[in-house]
Amino acid sequence: MFGSPFRPAWVNPDGMQVKAVILAGGRGSRLAEETEVRPKPMVTIGGMPILWHIMKIFSAHGVNEFVICLGYKGYIIKEYFANYFLHNSNVTFDLKANKMQVHENEAEPWKVTLIDTGEDSQTGGRLLRVEKYLDGDEAFCFTYGDGVGDVDISALVTFHKAHGKLATVTAVRPPGRFGTMSLDGDTVSEFREKQVGPGSYINGGFFILSNKIFDYIENDATIWEDKPLRTLSSEGNLVAFRHEGYWQPMDTLRERQLLEEYWQSGEAPWKVW
């Protein structure tokens, strides 16, 4: 069976469970060979969607409630979870008797809410559309559906609660081609997309956000990484959680192959469960 023993959802000091919101609506144009037939988060690593790997990372730290932001080919993600036990269990079909027997059901302790956030909504717009499904939670996790890492989610949540600002972003050191953040201590003093230099930190996703961040998002056209993050940064309300461990996005076929090779080696760095 995949996974570790059941862990209850991470509970903040006020007794509320922390949910994880995952963006899963993009088209993944640089993975066209894979994403013509499925949404990018359903591209597989080791036979399992990268979305599943991301959820396992959170679940390893006790975060078991998820809100998934659907868009492009979102029905495929709905069908995957509707038939999750079939995808991950051995079954016997007795066609004559019209019966099905499930063997060794590979269940997860997850509650998954799947929300259509629009075919063409931007990242901020997708986040805004799921606000009402967070039940007014004081804080929640938020990340992209195409990147994995050995991020310590428990430490990340604790860090966010300690500094008291509105947003925490996981800052990572990547291979090139990403935007950068200037750090003043842990505070993000400037946020710039698509400008990277040697030794820079970038936005690695794995955010912890206060529900007050919805005041910074205007509509479906709002790009989360643009005005909202820049405004939070200029106000001193965006704090960086420095992650010096493994982090890898899956934006190209080459990166997918890299992740697949790690998984097949039995030494996938993001496998923290």
What are these regions (language model features)?
Residues F6, I77-G185:
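Conserved beta-loop-beta/alpha segment of the NTase-like Rossmann-fold superfamily
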Residues W10-N83, L114:
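N-terminal glycine-rich phosphate-binding loop and ensuing alpha1 helix
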Residues H53, R126-R129, P228:
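Well-ordered alpha-helical segments embedded in enzymatic catalytic cores
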Residues E138-T143, V148-K161, R173-G176, T187-W273:
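Catalytic-core segments of class I nucleotidyltransferases/pyrophosphorylases
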